[in-house]
């Protein structure tokens, strides 16, 4: 059976705003309190999805979560009508209101870790919801994600859904943003590469300025849940020094597709040993690693972070070459653009660039790779996916019109307490669940 890497992009939610909630994510803190444009943000994401679908790539859509999360506020002691809860939290805990209104679920690379059936002992695709323990505004996503994913991948014969790991410091898990797969054809076994920032039960190198969000113990637990072969699994520590420069997830400093790993030279601790280990394991699959290492002398870590050069999508083309999807910021930076221009003019695997304006997401710290969850599927598994979430020209028009109808074109912090915004969001999401045939996946629908 043929295999595909299918990208499931998150739709930006109606409460997209700049709150500076993500310590360690420098774009998030830099743009705190700016006025956002949720309508533009959603359209920028949709345009990227459509462009890639038009190129022939399999493209799916994942819906935003309900925000503000009134149910979370009630668990924290706020009571009364929904309007009273909003008024009370806005008056007495405004930062909390911002956190429970975050549209961060748009970054579906953090929704879950996914292992293809070719790598799992039971021959099924495994999903483990990420607990996102390190940040409150993200940790509250896990409960709804655990309902949404089975509504999309809703065939028990092909898909296995695991709950998030216990939400404790020892098991901090950030999902696919710290996970890569290296091999040949998508429907053949490959090497799964889990990247962690620290060890929870043993001493070792750790960052000093910013938190390491992913633990080795969490990555190991996910690998066990997914029934992966230890001979085809590697656990790699990210360089603590780059975490302290704003590389809060590995997808800010590395990206892979098939046998190609594109990364900064400072991305990993003990990089030479890491590459040797991967090469050895890939040789067992009769595959050869193509390692594209970007020197610090050509692109600094600071420039990589500010432009999200590595938070790109690396896509395989029919001619065997690779396409790199990058944000506008990468083109705007002279040193990054110089490097990329030389890269695609050479004889390496990457021979094409596609530039997208994703500034609304970028200002909150999420580039092209953040916005998508990669799911490797064979033909039978693709047919088992909820077909209504797969992007078609007709669905693009429907979603674009849906955004025009429901989204505001500017949002400030004071707007989060507006009860009309809550109702606008619920009305929009209720309609979206019908468009995507998801059923009652949101708390307001189930209560």
Swiss-Prot record:
UniProt keyword list: Arginine metabolism, Hydrolase
Record's subunit section:
Homodimer.
Q: Which family does it belong to?
A: Belongs to the succinylarginine dihydrolase family.
Q: Which InterPro entries match?
A: AstB_sf, SuccinylArg_d-Hdrlase_AstB
Enzyme Commission (EC) number: 3.5.3.23
Hydrolase as a keyword of this entry, yes or no, is yes
An example of a Gene Ontology BP annotation on this entry? arginine catabolic process
Active site (record annotation): 174, 249, 370
Q: So which residues are the signal peptide here?
A: none
Name by which UniProt lists this protein: N-succinylarginine dihydrolase
EC class name: hydrolase
């Amino acid at each position: 059976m043929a295999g595909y890497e299918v990208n499931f992009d998150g739709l930006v939610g109606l409460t997209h705003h700049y709150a500076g909630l993500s310590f360690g994510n420098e774009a998030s803190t830099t743009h705190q309190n700016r006025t956002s444009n949720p309508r533009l943000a959603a359209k920028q994401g949709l345009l990227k999805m459509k462009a890639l679908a038009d190129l022939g790539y399999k493209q799916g859509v994942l819906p935003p979560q309900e925000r503000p999360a009134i149910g979370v506020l009630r668990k924290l002691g706020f009571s009364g009508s929904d309007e009273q809860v909003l008024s009370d939290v806005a008056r007495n805990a405004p930062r909390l209101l911002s956190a429970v209104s975050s549209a961060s679920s748009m970054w579906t690379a953090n929704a879950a870790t996914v292992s293809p059936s070719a790598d799992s002992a039971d021959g099924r695709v495994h999903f483990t919801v990420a607990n996102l323990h390190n940040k409150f505004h993200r940790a509250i996503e896990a409960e709804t994600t655990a309902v949404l994913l089975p509504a999309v991948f809703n065939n028990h014969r092909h898909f296995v859904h695991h709950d998030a790991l216990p939400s404790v410091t020892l098991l901090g898990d950030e999902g696919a943003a710290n996970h890569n797969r290296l091999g040949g054809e998508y429907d053949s076994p490959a090497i799964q590469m889990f990247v962690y920032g620290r060890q929870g039960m043993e001493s070792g190198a750790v960052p000093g300025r910013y938190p390491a969000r992913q633990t080795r113990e969490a990555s190991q637990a996910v690998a066990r849940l997914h029934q992966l072969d230890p001979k085809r699994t590697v656990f790699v520590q990210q360089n603590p020094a780059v975490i302290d420069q704003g590389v809060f997830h590995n997808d800010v400093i590395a990206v892979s597709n098939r046998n190609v790993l594109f990364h900064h030279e400072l991305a990993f601790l003990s990089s030479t040993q890491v590459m040797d280990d991967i090469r050895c394991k890939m040789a067992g699959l009769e595959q050869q690693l193509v390692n594209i290492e970007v020197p610090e002398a050509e692109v600094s870590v600071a420039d990589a972070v500010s432009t999200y050069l590595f938070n790109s999508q690396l896509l395989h083309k029919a001619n065997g070459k690779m396409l790199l999807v990058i944000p506008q910021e990468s083109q705007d930076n002279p040193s990054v653009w110089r490097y990329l221009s030389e890269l695609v003019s050479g004889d390496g695997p990457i021979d094409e660039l596609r530039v997208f304006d994703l500034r609304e997401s970028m200002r909150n710290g999420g580039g092209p790779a953040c916005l998508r969850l990669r799911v490797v599927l064979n033909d039978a598994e693709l047919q088992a996916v909820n077909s209504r979430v797969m992007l078609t020209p007709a669905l693009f028009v429907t979603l674009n019109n849906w955004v025009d109808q429901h989204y505001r074109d500017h949002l400030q912090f004071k707007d989060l307490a507006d009860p009309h915004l809550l109702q606008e969001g619920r009305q929009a999401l209720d309609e979206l669940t019908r468009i995507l045939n998801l059923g009652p996946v949101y708390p307001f629908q189930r209560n």
